Amino acid sequence: MKLCVALDMASKEANLALAHELSGLDVWLKVGLRAYLRDGAKFIEELKGVTDFRVFLDLKLYDIPNTMADAAEVIAKVGVDMINLHASSGTHAMRTVMSRLNALPSRPLVLAVSALTSFDESEFSAVYNENLAAAVRKFSVMSYEAGLDGMVCSVFESRLIKDTTSTDFLTLTPGVRPFGESADDQKRVADLSAAKEQGSDFIVVGRPIYESNEPREICERILGKI
């Protein structure tokens, strides 16, 4: 299991300072929509310049197939190591993206978002008119058959996805509160032991690290447990 640290702070300077503080640790860095819109591809270059960090660019692509493929190709050429898109964009869109990326000399890992961890069962049903677990199964099969590398899901769906597809199909799980911290705006959260039990390949941790006075120490504690 790998730790992915969310760089969700309010300024590029704060995010870069955290990256420098974590230099040398075996962690991934997650760059979200706000940071990328504000700081652009140059920010990715700066992160890569700190040390040999691998970067997950969390933009959750969702559009018509060719537009998604165009965007994915541009993102891949920025040099990130993982990207994501919405499974609900459909099988054709996901296959179009993978066909485009597989034609490149190298490509990032591509994960599909099943259901945002800010959704609970009732909110998900109101949007998709479907049971959460059933939808996750459907989305995981669609993504697996489209040739993606894995899924973004809650800890509680990780084992379900692997049982439905393959143990090699990656799961990245946001909403992890390693030591029982507040859930904030997440609904389906879990701790480290649950993430390990459910077979998560990547865990995303943000606030418990960057809101700490000792973020490197928190990362080291997490790494020691995974």
From Swiss-Prot:
Reported EC number(s) for this entry are 4.1.1.23
- Residues spanning the signal sequence: none
Which reactions does this protein catalyse?
orotidine 5'-phosphate + H(+) = UMP + CO2
Q: List the disulfide bonds.
A: none
Q: Identify the metabolic or biological route this protein is part of.
A: Pyrimidine metabolism; UMP biosynthesis via de novo pathway; UMP from orotate: step 2/2
Sequence positions that bind substrate: 8, 30, 58-67, 117, 177, 186, 206-207
Top-tier EC class: lyase
Looking up Gene3D superfamilies in the UniProt record yields:
Aldolase class I
> Has keyword Ion transport?
no
Name the source's superkingdom: Bacteria
InterPro entries (UniProt xref): Aldolase_TIM, OMPdecase, OMPdecase_AS, OMPdecase_bac, OMPdeCOase_dom, RibuloseP-bd_barrel
List, alphabetically, the HAMAP family matched.
OMPdecase_type1_B
The UniProt function text for this chain reads: Catalyzes the decarboxylation of orotidine 5'-monophosphate (OMP) to uridine 5'-monophosphate (UMP).
| UniProt subunit comment | Homodimer.
UniProt family annotation:
Belongs to the OMP decarboxylase family. Type 1 subfamily.
This protein is called Orotidine 5'-phosphate decarboxylase
Organism of origin is Campylobacter curvus (strain 525.92)
Chain's gene name: pyrF
